[in-house]
Amino acid sequence: MANTNSAKKRIQIAERNRLENKNYKSTVRTLMKRCFVACGIFEKEPGDESKADLQKTFNLAFSKIDKAVKKGVLHKNTGANQKSRLSVALKKVLKEVV
């Protein structure tokens, strides 16, 4: 166990950062799931409202992924991979509807 005050503080900081990173990753996963659900809804019922909802969820997900990469929560390649998955899903849905 830590003996010095600085070591004890570092343990507290590491735990705080771990929880923040866990929360951030969870939010990214949730937003990605929402995007895929929005794709499914738009695929079944194409319309202006569902398309606007789809675009809004994609913008939120892309923004959150970029911020996670910027903060160092996600590796840049992981972020790029996730954004690519979302883009492929979006293009597939839009191509099928048109």
UniProtKB/Swiss-Prot annotation:
It comes from the Bacteria. Keywords: Ribonucleoprotein, Ribosomal protein, RNA-binding, rRNA-binding. GO terms for cellular component: small ribosomal subunit. The keyword rRNA-binding applies. GO terms for molecular function: small ribosomal subunit rRNA binding; structural constituent of ribosome. GO terms for biological process: translation. It holds the Pfam family Ribosomal_S20p. Belongs to the bacterial ribosomal protein bS20 family. Binds directly to 16S ribosomal RNA. This is Small ribosomal subunit protein bS20. The gene is rpsT.
